[in-house]
């Protein structure tokens, strides 16, 4: 059964035969890897049950290794791992989905790299986040199949990831006075939400940080993207002007609240600008 944790005595090189180790069986997606020695890798894995972990996959770069496929970036596998002093160690792995089509297209690959970097940025080691894991798995699936436009997946994923991380944009009440209104005309990134017409007249209340004009239609699409399952994102036709507004606001929202510059996002921008 996925995610079942058992206690067992594990005999392996460097571990005492009498040392009790915790063995976990869990689904996971490789976010990134670093080569180690001649044939090993350190994997950063977003798991379903254990949160983000760093695990050593011994010999995984050898052509005949049983861990070869499961140690590649973006691959979804079932892992059996045990926890050592500094790292987890991969004992077994069974590949569930490689999302192979992502690797055949540079633009898809660029999106996936950014999605993985975002997930790594907001996840914590050994703190489970099944919602984040399932979100990433679904997004990689639809990115691979091409059933949902990449740009739509991009915006939808970012908003849902921020929601899971505790940064859901406030679209229902004025971020300054707290009143509900149909007259929201600005979105403040620093304040994390919309600003009503009355409060928008006093620039001193919201002048810090990025502030965007926002229409009622844009707010409604924001709500749709936040509240709709990834699999149904393409059920609503979105005006290009509104989509571009949301894309700009979402980007600023993420960079501000996560306080990080993502190299993979810069690379994605370069790929899109090149017309690839």
Where is each model-derived feature located?
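Non-catalytic alpha-helical scaffolds and adjoining flexible linkers that form interface surfaces
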Residues: 4-6, 13-276
